[in-house]
Amino acid sequence: MSMRGFARAGHLPTLIAALLYFDVSFMTWVLLGPLAPFLRDELGLSPTQQGLLTAIPLLGGSLFRPVLGMLADRIGGRRTALIGMVLTLATLFLGWQYARSAASFYVLGFFLGLAGASFAVALPLASRWYPAEYQGLAMGIAGAGNSGTLMATLFAPRLAERFGWAATFGIAMLPVAVVFVLFAWLARDSPKRTAP
C-alpha cells in the first residue's frame, strides 16, 4: 500500500467532503454540552436537567443512525448528507431564534442527533470509492472529522461569553452552510453501490 496508490485509487474530493461534513456535524451534535453551563444559569436547570440536555443528542444520534444509513443506501450518501445538513441548519436556526425553555432544548437536542448520525453517511460515502486495501485509510481520514467535538468544546463557550448562548447557535450555522456548499460541489456517490 502506497500513498501514491491511495491518491489514485479513489475520489479525493469526496473524501475531503466527507471529512468536512463529518467535522461540522460532530461540532453541531455536541454543541449543547459546552453550552450547558450557560443554559443552566439562564434557565435554572437542575443537575439532572443539565445531564439530560447533554444526553438527549446522543440518544437522537443513536436513533437516527440506522435511518440515515438506510436512506444513504436508498438515495445515495451525497443526497442524504445534503438533506441532513439542511435539517441541521434548521435545527440550529430554531435554537438561535426560538428555544428558550428546558423542554424546547430537549426537542432541539434530539434533532441535533441528526448531525450525530452523520458517520452512517460520511464513512460509506468516502470508503466506497476505494478498493478494499485502502478502505481503512479512507475511513480513518473521513472519521477524523470527529475532531468537530473539539471545535465545539473550544469555541462554543467563548462565543457564548462574547455574544450569548442563543447567538452561538446562529454562528454555528456559518460553518455548516459553508460545508454544505463545498460538499455539494465536491462530493459524488461512488458508482459502486456497496463496499467490496
Locate predicted features.
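Residue-level signature of mid-helix packing/kink "hotspots" within the transmembrane helices
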Residues: V30, L58-P66, A117, T149-M151
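Cytoplasmic helix-loop-helix junction between adjacent transmembrane helices
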Residues: Y106-G145
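Extracytoplasmic
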Residues: P13-L45, L68
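Helix-loop-helix hairpin linking two adjacent transmembrane segments in secondary transporters
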Residues: I141-P191
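Interfacial helix-cap and linker-helix signal at transmembrane-aqueous boundaries
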Residues: L39-R40, L71-A72, P157-F163
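Extracellular/periplasmic helix-loop-helix junction of adjacent transmembrane segments
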Residues: L35-S62, A103
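Conserved MFS/SLC helix-loop-helix module at the cytosolic interface between two early adjacent transmembrane helices
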Residues: L63-S101
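A generic transmembrane-helix signature of 12-TM secondary carrier transporters
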Residues: M85, L89-F93, L108-G109, M173-F180
